[in-house]
């Protein structure tokens, strides 16, 4: 049984990067849970001081596209200099992509294997729909629909509070709903509604496509979670924001755009 203090504890969710393009004011997607679990690595080293990087217990990667894995080499180099290692969890497809294209000894040092006696990236291959535990948090990888093999992660804190981060996804996200029941849903909206055909073709969401998935969630689960959106195109963000506000009003639930530095207490 949880103590009273544990029941009152808040789960901290910090958005280090919230966009699909990087600039002086926007970063690629990375989300930090309770300062120790990182969801994707688009904006980790550019956002966190070394001390905070060393506090990470795990980096969970959804898929192998550049904007989600970019900082893995830099994390490996920092781990080398500070004589430690970083634990990375992802599918075999992600490991293969890192090893062949990114940490291949040509673009950057292969920290998956070097130094031989103690590789700086300790990589654990995960299986979709097979839960595992990191630092007391239960992690469930759930397949989602995207142009590369992708899993979202349901993260359940020791006190039972739950979030689900989809990573990049398009129409068909409802196939994940039977496996997850979050209080907080972190998903993507890449473009405004006028790009719906693009979203269907490239497997990304617009507000109108998100609406279809949320209605399916509500039908299956009987409720709607708090929703926070990432992976926005900065050029179209004002248009996306207006459409998301309308969607939030229509569905009667909190749906907001994330921003760099945003913190939610769950």
Segments and roles (model prediction):
Residues 38-42, 57-67, 89-91, 164-169, ...:
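Active-site neighborhood of phospho(di)ester-bond hydrolases with catalytic His/Asp-centered motifs
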Residues 13, 31, 39, 63, ...:
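Divalent metal-coordination and catalytic microenvironments
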Residues 45-90:
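Active-site metal-binding motif and surrounding structural segment of the metallo-beta-lactamase
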Residues 94-150, 157-158, 254-264:
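Metallo-beta-lactamase
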Residues 48-53, 132-135, 175-178:
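Short amphipathic alpha-helix with an adjacent loop that forms part of the alpha/beta core around
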Residues 171-261:
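Cap/insert and terminal regions of metallo-dependent hydrolase folds
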Residues 8-52, 151-167:
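Conserved beta-strand hairpin/beta-sheet module of binuclear metal-dependent hydrolase folds
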Residues 78-84, 107-114, 214-224:
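Alpha-helix termini
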